[in-house]
């Protein structure tokens, strides 16, 4: 079990309050020990966002998921890995780090001071969605067991990661903010 919140699906957009800083406190279920989000942690399970758009574009994973950390050019990256899967975590972490390093070489300066990959390992389904400082990706639990599946998750993560630049920062004004 876990909790996952996509704020764009559950928060109301209030233009009157959109420009100012936002605060969020999470009270996890008593059995859940971890919260992963790209929002700035200000202690415990309390978070802040610069404005409503940043809050709305910051998904939240709550539970007892695995957390793996790495850096790309001194920028902290984290993987929040929910659900059982037969994965070589050392190889997977190294491959995700290599992908992120190569992406930054292609595009140049990194637009974030931190980044979060939320990965849901499910019985079925899949896909991903980019966010301002993170992505949420869903794959089947067996994804890591075949070369084709493993290449698929790496392609998905690379695709969503490139959206840091193309879509989240390089886009028509109509797709603002």
Task: Kindly give the residue locations of the regions a language model identified.
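Juxtacatalytic substrate-recognition/specificity segment
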Residues: 66-177
């Amino acid at each position: 079990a876990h909790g996952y919140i996509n704020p764009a699906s559950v928060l109301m957009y209030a233009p009157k309050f959109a420009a100012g800083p936002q605060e969020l406190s999470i009270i996890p279920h008593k059995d859940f020990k971890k919260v992963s989000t790209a929002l700035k942690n200000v202690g415990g399970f309390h978070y802040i966002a610069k404005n409503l758009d940043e809050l709305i574009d910051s998904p939240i994973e709550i539970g007892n998921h695995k957390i793996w950390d790495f850096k790309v050019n001194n920028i902290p990256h984290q993987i929040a890995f929910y659900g059982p899967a037969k994965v070589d975590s050392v190889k997977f972490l190294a491959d995700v780090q290599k992908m992120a390093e190569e992406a930054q070489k292609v595009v140049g300066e990194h637009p974030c001071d931190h980044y979060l990959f939320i990965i849901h390992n499910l019985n079925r389904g899949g896909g991903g969605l980019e966010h301002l400082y993170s992505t949420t990706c869903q794959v089947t639990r067996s994804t890591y067991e075949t070369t084709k599946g493993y290449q698929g998750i790496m392609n998905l993560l690379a695709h969503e990661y490139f959206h840091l630049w193309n879509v989240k920062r390089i886009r028509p004004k109509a797709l603002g903010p």
